[in-house]
Amino acid sequence: MFAAYRPIFSLLRGTAFLLAASGLHGLLLPLRGQAEGFSTAALGLMGTAWAAGFVAGCYLAPHLVRRAGHVRAFGTFAACAAIIALGTGLVIDEIVWIALRACTGFVMAGAFMVIESWLNEKATNENRGTVFGLYMMVTYASIMAGQMTVALADVGQASLFMVVGILFCLSLIPTAVSTQATPQPLQNVSLDLRRLYANSPVAFAGCFLIGVANGAWGTLGAVYGARIGISTAEIALMMSLVVVAGAVLQMPVGRISDRTDRRYVLAACAVGAALIGGIVFLATPRTGSYVIAMTAAYGALAYTLYSLAVAHANDHASAGEFAKVSGGLLLLYGYGTMVGPVLGAALMSAMRPESLFLATAAAHAAIAAYTLLRIRRRAPVPREEREAFKTLPADRAGTPQGARLDPRTRPQEGA
C-alpha cells in the first residue's frame, strides 16, 4: 500500500518545503517593512503585486514548462524564489520589494502548477480522494509551520531571509532526484467570464469578493498586528490560527450545506464574518489574547466561504466541467486578491489599523446581500443532484491545474 504512495510522498515533501518558505516569506516581509517604516500603501501594493504575478504565472507558466520539462522548470522556479527571497533580505527598499513580490507570485504559480499536475498524474480514481486530502493536510501544516518560524528570530536581522532561501532550495531536491516519469504537458489556462457567470452568478461574484477580503487580510493582517502593539509571536499565532480555524470549520459547515440550499449557508457565514469584522473595528481590541480569539473566529467563518462558493458552482456545472469551472473561479479569486490589499491599505491609511476589517466587512456584506438577492431569483439544486462538499485551501491562491486533483473532477477532465 505504502509503495503505491511513495512517489506521492516525495512530491509532498517538496510541497511542504515550498509552502513553509512561502508562508514564512509572506509574513516576514510586511513585518520587516513595517519595522523599516514602509508606507501602508507600499505594503498593500506588495500583496497586489504578488497576486498579479501569480495570475500571470497561471497563464504563462504552462508554456515555460512545455519548453523546459517539469523537473527543470520546477528547479528553475524554486531557485528563482530562493534568489528573490535572499534579494529582499539584501535590498531593503519598498519599490524593489514590490517588484520582487510580483516575481515571487509568478514563480510560485509555476511551481504550484508543476506539483499539482504531477500529483494529479500519480493519483488514480481509487486514491484521488486520499491524495487530495494529503495535499490539503500538507498545505495547512506547512503554511502554519512557516508562519510560526518568524517568531524564532528578530525580523530586523537577515537570518530569517536566509531560512526562506534554504527552504526554497530544499523544495527542489525531491523532484530533482526523482526517477518517476514526468507528467503530461500542462494545459493552457483560459477564463470565460460569461460562461462562469451563467453557470453560477453567486459563485462568480462570491469568489471575486472572497479574494478581495482574503487578499486584504493575508497581506495586511500582520501589519495590523504590529501597529496595535502585539508581539511577533502573537502575530504569527494570529495569522496561523485564522487559517486553522477556517480549515476546522469547513467540514461541519460543508455538511450542513449538503443538506440545505448552500446559498443560505454561504450568506450566513458571510454575515458572521462581516459582523466580527465590524466588532473588531468598533471595539479596537489591543490585548493579544483577545485579538487572537476574535481573528480566529473571523477566520473560521471567512475561510469557509471559498469552498462553499465552489461547491455551489459545481452543483450547477454539467458533467465533466468541474475542472474548467473551478479553474475559472480560482482566477477570479486571484483577481480579487489584487484589489483587496489596495483597498485595505487605503482604509488603514485614512483611519486606523482596525480599518482593515472595514475592507473585509464590506466584501463579506456584499457577498451576503448578493447571495440573498439571487436566492429569490433562482431555485436551489435538488439534493440528489448535488456534488458532495469538499474542503479547499483559501489561505493562498490556487492554480487551475490544482482543480484537476479534486476528487470531484471527472476522469476525462484530468486527462
Segments from the language model and where they lie:
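Intrinsic disorder in cytosolic terminal tails and internal cytosolic loops
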Residues: 1-3, 183-191, 315, 374-415
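Structural signature of the two symmetry-related core transmembrane helices
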Residues: 72-86, 165, 264-279, 361
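Helix-loop boundary and gating motifs at the non-cytosolic
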Residues: 2-51, 203, 215-224, 228, ...
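Cytoplasmic helix-loop-helix junction between adjacent transmembrane helices
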Residues: 102-137
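C-terminal transmembrane helical hairpin of 12-TM major facilitator-type secondary transporters
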Residues: 263-307
